[in-house]
Amino acid sequence: MAFVAASILPFSSCSDFLDREPITKPEAGNFLTGAIQVENYINGLYMTLPSFSKFGLGVRSEEKNSDNIIAEKYEARLHGQNNQFSGASDWQTGYQNLLKVNYFFHNYKVPEAQENEDVLSLKGEAYFLRAYWHFDLLKKFGSIPVMDAFWDENATIAGLQIPAKTRNEVARFILSDLVEAKNLLHSRGKYSGIRINKEAAMVLAMNVALYEGTWEKYHSSDDFASSTNESNYFLGEVINWGNELFGCGIDLYKTGQNPGDAFAALFNSKDLSGMGEVLLWRKYSSDEGVFHDVNGNLKAGVVDSEGAAGITQSLVDNYLNADGTFIDPTNEKFKDFKETFEGRDPRLIQTVMNEGAKFASATTATPMHLEEYTDEKKNTISPPKLAGDGNTRSLTGYHIRLGIDTTFVSGNGETALPIIRYAEGLLAYAEAAAELEMWSDDIANKTLKALRERAGVKYLAPAKDANFTDFGYTLTPVLQEIRRERRSELALQGFRLDDLMRWKADKLIVGKRGKGAYVGDESILFKSYSPDNQKRIRERLTLDDNKWADPMAGTLPSGYQFHADRDYLLPIPPSELELNKKLKQNPKW
């Protein structure tokens, strides 16, 4: 790796032991020989896991890289605007993080007599993290060199001529690391999900196997195909890991109140320790100097911190009615912003701002309320920010509600971040079973039905929905409903792009651009604005021929120009190809 040949970046830790000598020189005696040293080093590696930053929205706005959010600062990859250097940062980040993990393995010298369960669990965390970062690179680049050993600054150019493993070999390596992790890790209950644990490793393994299994199925006849199609093997691994996960006694989080409240609590709470469904999560505390600004951004109506944006009508239309029936998006009722949310899947109501929902504490934010504007009522009317400025402006009429802390007034954000949930495992199991044609009532009850009933949606046997997303190939009703459920359950959590890539879903991207709510003159949405703001909206917001918001019509007149023969993978950085002559560039780059 070029960055290895040039220099090894320093890795900071709170441990005095690790601060004494550069970690790139293990020969100097920097061995990890005791429990405290091991724990301090592993604690530092947690910085590489997903987090909310002190600025911006983090994962909440990440899905502008998909069909869930449309943004003025759109994703270059979707529009075919990546270049040969577009993968450089992801490549470097991935291998730098792997370098840090492998430094641990290289210098782990704890005597066997001192390897108690706690020390071994820390070692399991390292295996998990090595799997995690190889998976990240696999998704982005496909076939990659496996970094299963420590490459220090003394590595020679000749020593770095390492061929890439085929993608299925990489996936097998990742799963083998997760077997090691699972066998060493404590269960979730030991640290209430605040540390990497056995159950989190199982769900990560299911996600890896599902990704590879479906990639190999749907890309079997294109330039991104694996040299050996092992789709059924990997899908079978999802089932194997899932069967073990089912034995762990985990339940979906529920409350005795409104079903939607349980789903919302997963994302708007400060403490997730009592929610066993959240297998791994990140805690924030101003008292400990660890906080974020997600609450402040959501309070302001921000969907993308880089500019104006909005949740798409496509995502809104994905959700079922609460009685389990499909919606007909052509029904006139959906031209009414308020009626759009009535009688729907409670997850829609908890994910997208709607009538009566608060952007923050009621003491500082007026609940969203649409009503025909009059001077007498102007102080109680609070429509979406279609007439806003900068990044508070909505392009579609749909703001983010997921994660809003309705007790937040001002200052630092402290809502926790779920990293891995049990629900992901249920969705992976359901999809693998359907792909393997082993769907049954028992599997439905454990997965799809359980998720819908927790959300407050009646479970109906899957049937064909004529209005469901057209992927360009035939889906069984079961797969249709599983894909719908993934989008509903995992919206705005960073999964959608990965799903589109593994499903070979370029038909949902090429020539498409996200649209928004109905904004005709007679709509309650439009009538809720003052005359000045109505004029402003008409000057700034493009509508399609049927009066639905089409905000990117001028910028993307022909829709996204994703290159289906190239953009499913990122380009390997030119510097890496120059250094390692055994690497081969990805298709069409």
Positions of PLM-derived features:
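C-terminal motif of bacterial Sec signal peptides marking the signal peptidase cleavage site
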Residues: F11-S13
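Conserved, well-structured interaction surfaces
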Residues: G34-P50, A71-F141, I157-G193, F337, ...
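Structural register within alpha-helical repeat arrays
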Residues: K123, R130, A205, E212, ...
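A glycine-rich, coil/turn loop motif that links secondary-structure elements
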Residues: E117-G124, K190-A201, Q257-P259, D470-G472
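C-terminal substrate/ligand-recognition segments
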Residues: F341-E453
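Long, intrinsically disordered, low-complexity segments
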Residues: G94-N97, F173-L175, P259-N321, N412, ...
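An aromatic- and glycine-enriched ligand-binding surface/loop that stacks and positions planar moieties
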Residues: S15-Y74, I144, D148, E180, ...
